[in-house]
Every structure is written in structure tokens, then in C-alpha cells.
Amino acid sequence: MSRSKKSRKPGTNSNDQLVVVRTRSESELESRLRKKLKKRKGLKSGSRHSEGSESQVRQAAQKRDPRLGSKKPIPLIVAEPKKLNKQERKLAAEQELAMLEKDAQLNVLLDRLDNGEKLGIGLQKYVDEKLDRIEVLMEQLGLLDDEPEPAPAPQSKPTKKRKTEDDLLSEFEQLDVDKYQD
């Protein structure tokens, strides 16, 4: 029979406590393992390019997202835009004109102008641009009357004749300067 030792732990004087019995072979094995682990402090031996890394590269290639990279061909030359014929341009102009006539914001601003309100610079610019575009479209479609708008009636202020240089000079010479001194 092999020899067994009792372990000595402080406070184990009483017989009630558990006694640990170790055999010599167990303690030798434990000490060898501890010594072996103590010696190995660095990394495992081997080269950087081990066979295990090749399998990792293959796995990484398989895990790649299939959405990366499109198989759709990309045109290298920009195609020229298709030109519209007269009929298509006329339809497009009619649609744009109808859209401008239905523009709610433009209608509200025109109503405000009719009521005599003054618009801000930005709003007035917006109204002018839209009205100019409507005029161009109507001209393209042949809806615009060629008659010029009637000129506004002249105001009731009497118009003065333009004075000649001689009249202005005589008026200046007759001017009483003392009247303007304080």
C-alpha cells in the first residue's frame, strides 16, 4: 500500500473536520502540471503562415456579402437625351400651362395683388417668373393675342412743356436768392 499524508491546514485540530488524503503519485502529477504551465509563458511555437490560416481565408471569402458588387453593366458612354418632336413638345407645353394655371399659391398671390396688397420681394419675383413662363407657353401654343395691352389712361395732371435752355437760364437769373436765406 502506498503511503498517504494528511494535509496540514490551520485550525484543523479537531477530529470533526474532513481529512484530505493525497497519494504520492497525485501530488507528483499536480506538481509536474504546474511546472509545465509555469514554463509556457509565450505564444505557441510555429510559423506565421500556418495551414489553419488558409482555411480561415476560405471561410472569410464564403461569408462575404453577396450584395457587394453589382453584375449590372454600366454604360461607359453617356447617351444623348432623346429629342421631342413638335407634337410631344406641344403636349408638354399644354400640360405645363395647365399646371401653372392650377397653381394654388400663384392664384392666392394674384388675388392679393388684385386687392391692392404689396408683396415682398421674393413673392413678387415668384409671381413675375410664373407669369412670364405662362406668357411664353401661351405664345408657343398660339393662345396669346398679338394685340398690345391698352396703355393706362393719362392722369389728370396737366403736362408742362419742356423748357428750353434759354428759358431755364432766364429763370435762374431772375431767381431771388435772399428768399432762401435764413
Curated annotation (Swiss-Prot):
GO molecular function: GTPase activator activity
Secretion signal, residue range per the UniProt entry: none
Keywords noted in UniProt: GTPase activation, Ribosome biogenesis
Alphabetical list of InterPro entries matching this protein: YihI
Compositionally skewed regions (Basic and acidic residues) per UniProt: 23-32
Gene Ontology BP terms: ribosome biogenesis
Spans annotated as Disordered: 1-79, 143-182
Record's compositionally biased regions (Basic residues): 33-47
Recorded family membership: Belongs to the YihI family.
Subunit description: Interacts with Der.
Function (record text): A GTPase-activating protein (GAP) that modifies Der/EngA GTPase function. May play a role in ribosome biogenesis.
Name of the protein described by the UniProt record: Der GTPase-activating protein YihI
Taxonomic lineage of the native organism: Bacteria, Pseudomonadati, Pseudomonadota, Gammaproteobacteria, Vibrionales
